[in-house]
């Protein structure tokens, strides 16, 4: 290999010289760190799907005498977090140590408190004993700013249940502070940060959990746990599970069957009457819901379970829960389709059934916020299908009368007329191209679909069909909307999309007394 030399004396390769190309970070077979150097918060490269990806260590643990690490892959969804062994770690690349976060505000407050103490000691106003039982207000606080003991600022309420900086609480406090109204977690990072189970066997399905669920700690030592798909009871060994199954006689959820068609059934269960079963359901669902942590206080909720029937019995496909008395008008608290039944259309059936119940109650409803990412996608798809079908068929009276006779009956009983009422309500004119068809109000759409006006306007805006033209709102049925409608109708005709039949619902809205709604602790 011939090498030349330039005028400055630096060796330069000739044109026929081979040049080695490497990464900025030189890789070698020599280990740059050991297992003992790995701490919580550090970042390293981990083998995932045949390639090395940057991951953060969230926790380490001794499992059956071997050290395992819980990692979060950078720029990937949290549900891909997993426990790994040391043989999947690339020890030839440098370990990235965690950065220590310094809160500047705390430093400033600490500095001010020190200076104030010094000034007080010089003036002789402070003794040796600490008498600061009430915190002094910050000098930088503007007049009128509420203190800890002042009334709550209603404009700054965290209505979505999201965690704010400085509001972190421990896992024990989180469990103690579970809400008696709703099902939101109050602390995402501590409770659901580390997944504690590796594999779940539910009936004939092997499912990999996504998130943490507070199952008994002895089960977390097992490679897999077994769950009965009828009682939802959990076991750490196959022998225990098989022995239980030989004695188990339950073939369906322990509630009232309120709906059945050729494909699915729905069961209503009172959380107060079936505490054990509902708690087992919440434990199972918490494995796949990141932002919910309700698993113990089931008394304030009704559970609606969707099942499919086989020769063995009715198997749980998914469920949703709702508060017996919701101050916010929610018709769904938690909603979940089990992963082994996802991408089969069951999620939309659950959503459709929740609105079917709202229709019987003569109420509008909306799911409790915030929704999970998959839940939000399912709701948006359902809202889109519902509004596209309604608006297109409303623009074509023949299709509307043919496919929605029950909606016409409901609209007639509620408004005494299908035509929009005069002035005073927000209305929109439906147009198809340049041909105006009919008027419809947002309130009427809400009355027909049982969706809230907020969800309706959100969906219309997302579809980009709500316009303002010549002093009035119009809904433009575009070619894209017509294509969506044709695709939807084709799915229904080809029986690729299952629709629930309201006439097969046998249900009366439950009524509860004040004593029944009083939560016993």
Swiss-Prot record:
Residues 1-32, 100-154, 403-438 are annotated as: Disordered. It is found in: Nucleus; Chromosome. A zinc finger (C2HC MYST-type) spans 225-250. This is Histone acetyltransferase ESA1. Residues 192-509 form the MYST-type HAT domain. InterPro entries: Acyl_CoA_acyltransferase (IPR016181), Chromo-like_dom_sf (IPR016197), Chromo/chromo_shadow_dom (IPR000953), HAT_MYST-type (IPR002717), MYST_HAT (IPR050603), Tudor-knot (IPR025995), WH-like_DNA-bd_sf (IPR036388), Zf-MYST (IPR040706). The active site is at residue 368. The keyword Signal does not apply. Residues 39-90 form the Tudor-knot domain. Residues 114-123 have a biased composition (Basic residues). Residues 124-133 have a biased composition (Low complexity). It comes from Debaryomyces hansenii (strain ATCC 36239 / CBS 767 / BCRC 21394 / JCM 1990 / NBRC 0083 / IGC 2968) (Yeast). It catalyses: L-lysyl-[histone] + acetyl-CoA = N(6)-acetyl-L-lysyl-[histone] + CoA + H(+); L-lysyl-[protein] + acetyl-CoA = N(6)-acetyl-L-lysyl-[protein] + CoA + H(+); 2-hydroxyisobutanoyl-CoA + L-lysyl-[protein] = N(6)-(2-hydroxyisobutanoyl)-L-lysyl-[protein] + CoA + H(+); (2E)-butenoyl-CoA + L-lysyl-[protein] = N(6)-(2E)-butenoyl-L-lysyl-[protein] + CoA + H(+).
């Amino acid at each position: 290999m011939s090498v030349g030399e330039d005028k400055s004396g630096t060796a330069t390769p000739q044109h026929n010289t081979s040049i080695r190309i490497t990464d900025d970070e030189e890789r070698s077979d020599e280990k740059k760190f050991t297992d003992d150097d790995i701490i919580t918060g550090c970042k390293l490269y981990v083998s995932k799907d045949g390639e090395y990806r940057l991951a953060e260590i969230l926790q380490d643990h001794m499992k059956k005498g071997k050290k395992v690490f819980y990692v979060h892959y950078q720029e990937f969804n949290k549900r891909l977090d997993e426990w790994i062994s040391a043989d999947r770690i690339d020890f030839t690349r440098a370990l990235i140590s965690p950065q220590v976060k310094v809160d500047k505000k705390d430093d400033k407050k600490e500095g001010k408190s020190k200076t104030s103490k010094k000034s007080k000691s010089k003036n002789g106003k402070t003794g040796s004993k600490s008498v600061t039982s009430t915190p002094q207000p910050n000098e930088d606080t503007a007049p009128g700013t509420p203190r800890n003991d002042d009334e709550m600022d209603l404009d700054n309420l965290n209505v979505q249940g999201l965690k704010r900086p400085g509001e972190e609480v421990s896992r024990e406090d989180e469990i103690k502070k579970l809400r008696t109204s709703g099902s939101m977690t109050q602390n995402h990072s501590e409770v659901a940060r580390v997944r504690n189970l590796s594999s779940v066997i539910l009936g004939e399905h092997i499912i990999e959990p996504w998130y943490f669920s507070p199952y008994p700690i002895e089960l977390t030592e097992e490679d897999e746990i077994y769950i009965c798909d009828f009682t939802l009871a959990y076991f750490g060994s196959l022998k225990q599970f098989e022995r239980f199954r030989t004695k188990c006689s339950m073939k369906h959820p322990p509630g009232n069957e309120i709906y059945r068609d050729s494909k699915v059934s729905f069961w209503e269960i009172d959380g107060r009457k079936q505490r054990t079963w509902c708690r087992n359901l919440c434990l199972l669902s918490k494995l796949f819901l990141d932002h919910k942590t309700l698993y113990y206080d089931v008394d304030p909720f009704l559970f609606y379970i969707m099942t499919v029937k086989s020769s063995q019995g009715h198997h749980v496909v998914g469920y949703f829960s709702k508060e017996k008395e919701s101050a916010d008008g929610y018709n769904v608290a938690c909603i979940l389709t089990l992963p082994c039944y996802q991408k089969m259309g069951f999620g939309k059936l659950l959503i459709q059934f929740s609105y079917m119940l709202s229709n019987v109650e003569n109420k509008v409803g909306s799911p409790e916020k915030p929704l999970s990412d998959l839940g939000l996608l399912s709701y948006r798809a359902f809202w889109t299908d519902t509004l596209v079908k309604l608006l297109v068929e409303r623009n074509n009276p023949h299709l509307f009368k043919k496919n929605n006779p029950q909606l016409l009956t409901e609209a007639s009983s509620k408004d005494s007329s299908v035509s929009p009422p005069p002035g005073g309500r927000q209305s929109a004119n439906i147009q198809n191209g340049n041909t105006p068809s009919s008027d419809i109000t947002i309130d009427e759409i809400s009355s027909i679909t049982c969706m809230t006006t907020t969800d309706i306007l959100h969906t219309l805006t997302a579809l980009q069909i709500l316009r303002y033209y010549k002093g009035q709102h119009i809904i433009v049925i575009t070619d894209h909307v017509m294509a969506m409608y044709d695709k939807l109708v084709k799915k229904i005709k080809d029986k690729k999309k299952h629709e629930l039949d309201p006439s097969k619902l046998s249900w009366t809205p439950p009524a509860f007394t004040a004593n029944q709604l009083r939560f016993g602790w």
